Regions:
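Structural motif
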Residues: 119-120, 221
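Active-site neighborhood of phospho(di)ester-bond hydrolases with catalytic His/Asp-centered motifs
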Residues: 18-19, 45-49, 85-90, 111, ...
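Conserved beta-sheet core of the metallophosphoesterase superfamily
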Residues: 102-113, 130, 134-144, 191-253
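Core catalytic region of metal-dependent phosphoesterases/phosphodiesterases
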Residues: 2, 8-14, 23-119
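Anionic group-transfer/hydrolysis microenvironments
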Residues: 21-22, 52, 130, 253
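Active-site-proximal loop/helix segment associated with metal-binding centers of metalloenzymes
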Residues: 127-192
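C-terminal regulatory/interaction regions
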Residues: 2-3, 252-272
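Hydrophobic, well-structured mid-protein blocks that either form specific transmembrane helices
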Residues: 120-128
Length: 272
C-alpha cells in the first residue's frame, strides 16, 4: 500500500467512505479527521451519515476552527472533481426532508442511499443503517437517552485521554472498550450486522457499507460482504478502496500513535 510517508504526502484512493463524524460535538475528533482529509484524495467520497450532529443544535453545541476546517476540506475535494455523496443519518436527519428534491449543493449530492460499483466489479449498497436499529426507529426517547449517556461516556473519555497524553501514553478509547465488554451490546451489534447483510442479499448486492453503530468491521455474513466504516468519535476509522478494487479499513488514530505514517489494516473480509 502506498501510505503517506510524511505529513506532506497525500495518498490517492479510488474511493473513501467516512461516517459518524458528529461535527458540532466535543467528542468529534476533528483534528484526526482534518489530518486524514488533508492527506488523502479520491475519485469518490461517501459521507455515510451523522456528519453534523443535529441532536446537539439546541444544547451542548460545540464548534471550533477544526470543525470548519473539516467542512472546507470536503468542499475543496468536491470543487477539485471528487464525486461527493452525502447520505444523512439519524443525527443529521434534518437534511432528509430535502432528499425528494435530489439536491446537489456545492458539488455534493444528497441521497438517501447509494450504489457503489468497485473497480473489481462488486456492487455495494451504501446506507447509514439507522433504519435497522429498532431503538432509533420505534423509541426515539430511548435513543435520545442513550445518546445522552454516550455523551457522558465520551466526556469522561476526553479527560481520561488528557491524563494519558500527559503521561506519554497513546490515545485509547475507554467507551469502545466498555462497549466490547457488555454482552448485550455485542449481541446488538451482531443483530445489526446480520440485518444489514440480509437487506443487501435481498436486494441482490454483493455487500453493504454502513455506519451508525461506531464499530468498524469488515467480514462476510452468509456470503455477503458487511462493512462498517466506523466513526470519528472513538475509533477514527475510514473505509478506502484502492484502484484495483481492494477494500481496506484504515485506523487513523493508530496511524497517529506511530512515529511513521503507515495505516494499520484492521481487517479484510474472511473467505466464505
Amino acid at each position: 500500500m502506498n501510505a503517506p510517508s510524511s505529513p506532506d504526502t497525500r495518498t490517492n484512493y479510488r474511493s473513501v467512505f467516512i461516517s459518524d463524524t458528529h461535527l458540532g460535538t466535543r467528542g468529534c475528533r476533528s483534528d484526526f479527521l482534518a489530518d486524514f482529509l488533508r492527506r488523502t484524495s479520491c475519485q469518490h467520497l461517501y459521507l455515510v451519515g451523522d456528519i453534523i450532529d443535529g441532536w446537539r443544535l439546541r444544547k451542548s453545541w460545540y464548534w471550533d476552527d477544526s470543525h470548519d476546517e473539516v467542512l472546507r476540506l470536503i468542499l475543496r475535494q468536491a470543487r477539485g472533481g471528487t464525486e461527493v455523496t452525502y447520505i444523512p443519518g439519524n443525527h443529521d436527519e434534518m437534511f432528509r426532508q430535502w432528499l425528494p428534491l435530489g439536491l446537489e449543493i456545492a458539488g455534493i449530492r444528497l441521497r438517501r442511499e447509494a450504489v457503489h460499483l468497485t473497480a473489481a466489479g462488486k456492487r455495494l449498497l451504501v446506507m447509514h443503517g439507522d433504519e435497522f436499529d429498532s431503538v432509533v426507529r420505534y423509541a426515539k426517547f430511548l435513543a435520545l437517552l442513550g445518546d445522552w449517556a454516550y455523551a457522558v461516556a465520551l466526556a469522561f473519555n476526553r479527560y481520561f485521554n488528557a491524563i494519558r497524553r500527559r503521561l506519554g501514553y497513546p490515545y485509547w478509547s475507554l467507551s469502545q472498550w466498555l462497549k466490547r465488554q457488555v454482552k448485550e451490546a455485542v449481541k446488538a451489534i451482531d443483530r445489526f450486522e446480520s440485518a444489514l447483510a440480509n437487506e443487501a442479499r435481498r436486494r441482490g448486492f454483493d455487500g453493504v457499507v454502513c455506519g451508525h453503530i461506531h464499530h468498524a468491521e469488515m467480514r462476510e455474513v452468509d456470503g455477503v460482504l458487511y462493512i462498517n466504516d466506523g466513526d470519528w468519535v472513538e475509533s477514527c476509522t475510514a473505509l478506502v478502496e484502492h484502484h484495483d478494487g481492494r477494500l481496506e479499513l484504515v485506523d487513523w488514530a493508530a496511524l497517529n500513535r506511530l512515529s511513521f505514517f503507515a495505516p494499520r489494516r484492521i481487517a479484510e473480509p474472511a473467505t466464505a
